[in-house]
Amino acid sequence: MPATAPIDAVMQALAVPTRRAVFERIVRSGEITVVELTRGSGVTQGAISQHLKSLKLAGLVVERPEGRNAYYRARPEGLEPLADWMGHYGAFWRDRFADLRTLLKEIDP
């Protein structure tokens, strides 16, 4: 089986709405346990664990075991492949906004 490119792994991990919500909650919390993630989520602990596994494999979170608990925190550098990919389109958007600015000035000098 061919290795997944980092951008593919990140996009696949964040493509699932529940997984995105888990990731966002980790980001907001700084560091959080599976039990805390499960509480109030409407998702089983087993499902949360599977989502965490996908996020870890994509390099988006890291796990820190402490006693009987495992604490999860986001890895901001895990989003770099996505940011790099999006950066390639920055010129496209800058050009489009420049064209829009020109058009607006022509319409309403």
Locate the predicted segments by residue.
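Histidine-centered divalent metal-coordination motifs
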Residues: 19, 50-51
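Alpha-helical residues within the helix-turn-helix
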Residues: 39, 50, 56-57
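Conserved H-loop
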Residues: 47
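C-terminal structural segments of small proteins and small subunits
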Residues: 79-103
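Generic C-terminal helix-cap and adjacent flexible tail
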Residues: 105-109
